[in-house]
From Swiss-Prot:
Protein name according to UniProt: Beta-centractin
Modified residues (3'-nitrotyrosine): Y4
Annotated family: Belongs to the actin family. ARP1 subfamily.
GO molecular function, one term: ATP binding
Keywords on record: Acetylation, ATP-binding, Cytoplasm, Cytoskeleton, Nitration, Nucleotide-binding
Native source organism of the sequence: Bos taurus
């Protein structure tokens, strides 16, 4: 097959989140596959023949057998810490269980958090070009893709996932690098804090598989309080949560105390800005003429914005920091868990996308410099 024909193939879009990886083909409306971005290794000795085969589990199989496995996330706060495991997960994306395709036959759009170390991007390019032999690669910023998904060209995206929270102002399709704000406080920190709070309430979760149970409790039971001081004073109604072993757990004030961390990182001694400050500071770092428009076009993206009460709380906090007469409008698209991937799918389907990517030939000639030249 001629290299041009291969480049004309449908691109593969991989939204490489710290917590969940979403993958599929450009042009599709939603990602074909979504699974936790972790690998599991058996932590006990195999004593029976015909027992679960394999030394490494990824995707649905790792979820299904997680009680037997030591779970490890190769990404922490948007940066890959273990490249071997990350490579295995990407290999699995192409396997017969997932996309069922050969990596060398499709260009790739890969997403990345803004203000990531450039070494992270260089290594990702090296893996895709040298290990997976992809014909072309484009590494795109997550928040900009979320805006593509809504069909807008102007707005400020507040994207909070599992590893990173960032705010990126975009005006008429131009992202403003100097205005980007990022903090490494996100969903996984909320899960860790919830585990600590549940321990104080009498429930102990200590293994890596039990941490996944805590994550599920967070997703199903936690909410953001509009007035945490008031809720602290009231006797919070406890919610019963059924654990995988059938026993029940009563979750009390931890339900709103844990996600409060997103707005008050100092609860765990972190000196980062709260999520509302990240958003407002990003707008204030933009040109004065653009601020009013940006305040009226705030868009939420990522799994950590799905907490019940998140939008109302964010609006009340932003109002305190914004100029008095400014109109504030926050949009929370229903598909915001996937909006980065959907934006990637739209971008990779456009004809102009072919001008944006780095081909294997360019990479062989210029190395990692080619990647930086074509990504912002």
């Amino acid at each position: 097959m001629e290299s041009y024909d291969i480049i004309a193939n449908q691109p593969v879009v991989i939204d490489n989140g710290s917590g969940v990886i979403k993958a599929g083909f450009a042009g599709d409306q939603i990602p074909k596959y979504c699974f936790p971005n972790y690998v599991g290794r058996p932590k006990h000795m195999r004593v029976m023949a015909g027992a679960l085969e394999g030394d490494l589990f990824i995707g649905p199989k790792a979820e299904e057998h997680r009680g037997l496995l030591a779970i490890r996330y190769p990404m922490e706060h948007g940066v890959v810490r273990d490249w071997n495991d990350m490579e295995r997960i990407w290999q699995y994306v192409y396997s017969k269980d997932q996309l069922q395709t050969f990596s060398e036959e499709h260009p790739v759009l890969l997403t990345e958090a803004p203000l990531n170390p450039s070494k992270n991007r260089e290594k990702a390019a090296e893996v895709f070009f040298e290990t997976f032999n992809v014909p072309a690669l484009f590494i795109s910023m997550q928040a900009v893709l979320s805006l593509y998904a809504t069909g807008r060209t102007t707005g400020v995206v507040l994207d909070s996932g599992d590893g990173v929270t960032h705010a990126v102002p975009v005006y008429e399709g131009f992202a403003m690098p100097h205005s980007i704000m990022r903090v490494d406080i996100a969903g996984r920190d909320v899960s860790r804090y919830l585990r600590l709070l549940l321990r104080k309430e009498g429930a102990d979760f200590h293994t890596s598989a039990e941490f996944e149970v805590v994550r599920t409790i967070k997703e199903r039971a936690c909410y953001l309080s509009i007035n945490p001081q008031k809720d602290e004073a009231l006797e919070t109604e406890k919610v019963q949560y059924t654990l995988p072993d059938g026993s029940t757990l009563n979750v009390g004030p931890a339900r709103f105390r844990a996600p409060e961390l997103l707005f008050q990182p100092d609860l765990i001694g972190d000196e980062s800005e709260g999520l509302h400050e990240v958003l407002v500071f990003a707008i204030h770092k933009s040109d004065m003429d653009l601020r009013r428009t940006l305040f009226a076009n705030i868009m939420l993206s990522g799994g950590s914005t799905l907490f019940k009460g998140f939008g109302d709380r964010l609006l009340s906090e932003v109002k305190k920091l914004a100029p008095k007469d400014v109109k504030i409008k926050i949009s929370a698209p229903q598909e915001r868990l996937y909006s980065t991937w959907i934006g990637g799918s739209i971008l990779a389907s456009l004809d102009t996308f072919k001008k944006m990517w780095v081909s294997k030939k360019e990479y062989e000639e210029d190395g990692s410099r080619a990647i930086h030249r074509k990504t912002f």
